Every structure is written in structure tokens, then in C-alpha cells.
């Protein structure tokens, strides 16, 4: 690739590195989780406390270490190492048991607890700080062939020079982190909490500056299911490099021997979007849908094509997402039959 140097005219006479697009090498996006978590890029996972965000990302990390299939059926990749930065959970009493419950290959899970530095009093351990330690983390990722770096939670690792609520401050930091991800090829998953502001677009619900989700190439909200508080949903908030991935749900299954819970993924996608889940559907609309579906079921016993149900519901003014919630509440199942689906 040829470097073209264009000299800026003016008092500063600075220099820019410029090259024509014809000399830019075409590249294909690589994926850790195909269609959801791009390799060499930044991804955000956000949610309220107690939505099992950390358990979720450790489940994903475990799959990377073993090459296990992805929850939506996407093919696994070759097993690889992961770097784990966790500021809120204990390594021995929480993180290791969760990794074991998820079936991780523990030897490939590198727990980045602190950095050893030389000081006036000799060798010292100090907490990891961003952006100060980005180059060090990148070297660690390269030396261990890590495919995934988890930062849980992002805010806990920010230097006091970084204002997480100021766009420019955050973007400068994430530009460095994104460059390190691109250089190493590792996906960087940053976990953060949702803010407390009700409503509004899903893009603006994450804690801190909008620059965080702006710098990420993919972002997901981890939310409680409005119909079942014990059920969680992972909904796409942003997807720059692939079509928006469908919402996927999961439950938590206790593992008494380890004293933690593991993720149990749903077998199919959920039709609701992040915006719908965050805004919530009116209880009156759901109640009307439940009443309508109860009556419809009484007049349509046995297995009925799902297309018929959707058509009849549409004529009654019930959107598919509300119908889905009503069907779940009533325990009406769907089944694959040949080329289509049936209910009953």
C-alpha cells in the first residue's frame, strides 16, 4: 500500500496521511458470534442490576473457550482464550463458579485482576486503568491469542481523567480501545448499567455518554421479560455491521453444587424489539389480546396454522408482538409442521 502525504497549507503546515480508496485493502468482517459480536471491534452489553448481565457474558466467554455452538444455532469458532476484567464480582467465589457452571475451559480464561508495576518501593500491584493500560491489555491479548476481552463494568475501569458523561472524553478513550481491538483481532465486550430515565429510545438508555454506544459497532440490552420477571431477554440496540439480530431469551438455572446459576437459552427467537421491551406494552392492550385469544381458541380447537391466527388477530387489531405475549401468558405452544408452523 502506497502512502500519500498531503501537506496542509497554512501557518501550522501539519502533515496528513492520505491515500485513495482504490488503495485501501478490502476486508471481510470477522465474527466471534456471527451476526452479533464482531471480532476486532467494540460491543456494548447493558442492563439494569440483577438482570444477570455478568452471568450472560461469562456464558459467552465459556463458549469461546470451548468452541461450543452459539444459542441461536450459529456455528462455533475454534476454541480460544478470553481476558476477563471484572470489578464487581469475586474471582474465587463468583466468577470461577459461574465459568465452571457454563462449561468453560478454565485454562483459557485469563482473570486480569491487577497490573504489576515497578515503583519507588519495588514491584507493586495496582488496579487496571483505562486508557493507561490499553497497550498492556493489547499485548496480553496478543500473547495469549485471546478472541474476546470482557470489561465488566466499563465505568469501574475509567481513569479519573475520563468523564464518562462527556462525549469527547469518552470517544477519545474508546478510539484507543477500538484501535487496540482492531490490532489484536479480539472482540471487546463492554458491560454497563442502564440509566434510570424512563422511556426514550433504546440507544439513549445506557449509563454515561451516548459516545459509548456510538463508538461500539454492536450494542445489546439485557432486559427482564414484562410477562415473566424470571425470564430475561437480550435485544439488539445497535448493529452497524450486520442486519439487526432478533431478540433472544434465557432463564437462570441454579447449580447448587457451585452456589451459582447458569444460563439456559431459549430454543427460538422472541419477536419483540428493544424499543418495545423498554417502553412496555399497555396492560389493557395485553388484557384485550388475552381475552380475544381465549375466545378464538375456544372456536379453533386442535392444531391450527399459525398464519391463520396471525391473520385473524390482525383483523381484530392485535399486533404480532401483543399476540405473542398473550399466547405465552395462556401457555399456547407453537410447533413446526412441514414448511410452516401451527398453534395448539
Regions from the PLM with identified roles:
Residues 3-106, 130:
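The Walker A/P-loop phosphate-binding site
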Residues 3-6, 10-12, 16, 142-145, ...:
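C-terminal regions of RecA-like/P-loop NTPase motor modules
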Residues 27-28, 49, 75-168, 172, ...:
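Conserved inter-motif catalytic segment of the P-loop NTP-binding fold
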Residues 44-45, 50, 54-55, 148, ...:
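Phosphate-binding/switch region of NTP-binding enzymes
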Residues 65, 178, 182, 314:
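Anion (oxyanion) recognition and catalysis
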Residues 108-110, 218, 333:
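Conserved beta-strand segments of alpha/beta enzyme cores
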Amino acid at each position: 500500500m502506497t502512502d500519500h502525504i498531503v501537506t496542509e497549507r497554512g501557518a501550522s503546515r501539519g502533515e496528513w496521511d492520505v491515500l485513495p480508496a482504490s488503495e485501501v485493502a478490502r476486508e471481510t468482517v470477522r465474527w466471534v458470534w456471527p451476526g452479533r459480536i464482531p471480532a476486532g471491534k467494540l460491543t456494548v452489553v447493558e442492563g439494569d442490576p440483577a438482570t444477570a448481565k455478568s452471568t450472560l457474558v461469562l456464558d459467552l466467554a465459556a463458549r469461546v473457550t470451548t468452541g461450543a455452538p452459539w444459542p441461536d444455532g450459529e456455528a462455533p469458532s475454534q476454541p480460544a482464550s478470553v481476558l476477563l476484567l471484572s470489578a464487581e464480582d469475586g474471582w474465587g467465589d463468583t466468577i470461577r463458579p459461574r465459568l465452571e457452571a457454563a462449561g468453560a475451559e478454565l485454562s483459557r480464561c485469563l482473570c486480569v485482576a491487577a497490573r504489576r508495576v515497578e515503583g519507588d518501593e519495588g514491584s507493586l500491584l495496582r488496579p487496571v486503568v483505562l486508557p493507561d493500560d490499553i497497550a498492556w491489555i493489547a499485548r496480553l491479548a496478543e500473547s495469549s491469542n485471546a478472541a474476546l476481552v470482557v470489561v465488566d463494568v466499563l465505568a469501574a475501569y475509567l481513569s479519573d481523567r475520563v468523564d464518562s458523561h462527556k462525549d469527547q472524553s469518552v470517544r477519545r478513550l474508546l478510539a484507543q480501545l477500538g484501535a487496540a481491538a482492531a490490532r489484536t483481532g479480539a472482540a471487546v465486550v463492554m458491560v454497563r448499567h442502564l440509566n434510570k430515565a424512563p422511556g426514550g429510545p433504546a440507544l439513549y438508555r445506557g449509563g454515561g455518554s451516548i459516545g459509548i454506544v456510538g463508538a461500539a459497532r454492536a450494542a445489546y440490552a439485557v432486559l427482564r421479560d414484562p410477562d415473566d420477571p424470571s425470564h430475561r431477554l437480550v435485544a439488539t440496540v445497535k448493529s452497524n455491521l450486520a442486519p439487526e439480530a432478533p431478540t433472544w431469551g434465557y432463564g437462570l438455572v441454579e447449580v447448587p453444587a457451585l452456589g451459582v446459576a447458569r444460563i439456559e437459552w431459549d430454543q427460538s427467537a422472541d419477536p419483540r424489539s428493544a424499543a418495545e421491551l423498554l417502553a412496555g406494552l399497555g396492560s389493557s392492550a395485553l388484557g384485550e389480546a388475552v381475552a380475544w385469544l381465549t375466545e378464538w381458541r375456544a372456536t379453533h380447537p386442535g392444531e391450527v396454522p399459525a398464519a391463520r391466527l396471525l391473520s385473524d388477530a390482525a383483523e381484530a387489531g392485535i399486533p404480532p408482538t401483543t399476540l405473542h405475549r398473550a399466547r405465552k401468558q395462556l401457555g399456547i405452544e407453537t410447533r413446526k409442521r412441514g414448511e410452516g408452523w401451527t398453534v395448539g
